[in-house]
Amino acid sequence: MRFKCFGSEETEQSSKIDKSIETDRRKLRKDVKLLLLGPGESGKSTIFKQMKIIQEDGGYSVEELLEYRAFVYSNCISQMEALLTASAKLNIELEVENKQRAANVLRRTIGNEPWLLLAADIKHLWEDKGIKETYAQKDKHFQLNDSAAYFFDNIDRYMREDFVPNEQDVLRCRVRTTGIQESEFTFDKIRLKIVDVGGQRSQRRKWIHCFDCVTAVIFVAAMSDYDQVLREDESVNRTRESLALFKEIVNCDYFKETPIVLFLNKKDLFKEKLKRVPLQSCFSDYTGPNKYKDAAMFIQSQYLAQGPSPRTIYTHATCAVDTENIKFVFRAVRQTILSQALEHF
């Protein structure tokens, strides 16, 4: 004998709920909102730009690339200005024939000084022994963008009248994020809405408005920043600041049920810096060898210790300017966040 547990009305209501859940599941498979968080200069905005490249039918049009030409010029000029200012503070002499070139760069006003003349001066200055000596002391005595050498090394290409920036130029261009960037991309048949918020302290109060309906949080931390200080507060170590910020995010009530993905970024720079700057100089409790694998595991453990136990935090070592690396990582992230998010339906 069969018993009816529900009347027709209850059965119909149950069916509607099941359909609603299935609709939500399908929508989740197609619509994913990712929140990119992290301190300033961690590489968040570079990853945001990578999404335009790795998405289906992605990449930058010639028109879009040309929009970055002025940013390329500006990055070259501002970074040489930083080197010249630092060389003066460090009492490092430039070669006699380059002193006028240095004056040209320092007194320039954007739009008034022809780019080709400034570029020629920058090219000669980058070959100056004094500038090379100054460059070797970056991070320790002054701040310089990670891609400064890349731009100087490519100055001949930038001096061509038919110069069109390539995707590496775009990825390496430093354009400070001062607000909220939001864009939609399609990656592996999933529609991603990615929100990138400025990481400087003054920008973080804006984050709260982005917390609704977030599928996952991607926190970007620069591993190579362990010996550097904040631009906005030179008394604060960048990695210490990043750890404190991650602790705040991972323990936030808004994200109790939200997957947290940690990108330990700039792994390439971290590997190179370890050859020059021991991790022990900034983390006295680190007792392992000054090798990439051991040091990276220590940095990872510092971040994982900020979260409540036994919460799972998905970690990936990344290089934001390496398109293939970011594509590989996002495929892993896609599977992880969808699997976990669907468990809650």
UniProtKB/Swiss-Prot annotation:
GTP binds at residues 38-45, 171-177, 196-200, 265-268, 320. GO terms for molecular function: G protein-coupled receptor binding; G-protein beta/gamma-subunit complex binding; GTP binding; GTPase activity; metal ion binding; mitogen-activated protein kinase binding; protein kinase activator activity; protein kinase regulator activity. CDD domains: G-alpha (cd00066). GO terms for biological process: adenylate cyclase-modulating G protein-coupled receptor signaling pathway; aggregation involved in sorocarp development; chemotaxis; chemotaxis to folate; MAPK cascade; protein localization; regulation of macropinocytosis; sporulation resulting in formation of a cellular spore. It holds the Pfam family G-alpha. Residues 33-46 are annotated as: G1 motif. Guanine nucleotide-binding proteins (G proteins) are involved as modulators or transducers in various transmembrane signaling systems. G alpha-4 plays a role in morphogenesis of the multicellular structure. Belongs to the G-alpha family. This is Guanine nucleotide-binding protein alpha-4 subunit. It comes from Dictyostelium discoideum (Social amoeba). The gene is gpaD.
